[in-house]
Amino acid sequence: MHLDAHTDVFTKVELFLGAKTSAAHWGAYLADQGQVDPTRSMQIRLRGHARTLDWLQPSYDYGYNVVTMKEFRSRGLADVVAQTRTVIGDRPVYITFDLDCLDPTIAPGVSNI
């Protein structure tokens, strides 16, 4: 379960300063390595990425179950929790929680440099 404002599945965004890997790419790396099954994974509260207009497409291409912030607000917590329980089932869960998934009015000091 991935709680974040960004997908972290970027495959076409260049790495920074010549880095070999990046925190913006880990979802793609793990799926490519078979370490994560995107069809059994949730990405929740995604809000966007300023570098590309098709920011959700890599997640969809990999098969991740995506709930954007807009969708989260529309559907409500109970419905998203129900979907998450269905998708994950009784399998072990790893939760990655990036503070930028919180609304900026709640966590105004959080940024992504």
List each model region and its residues:
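Conserved alpha-helical scaffold segments that buttress catalytic/binding sites
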Residues: 1-113
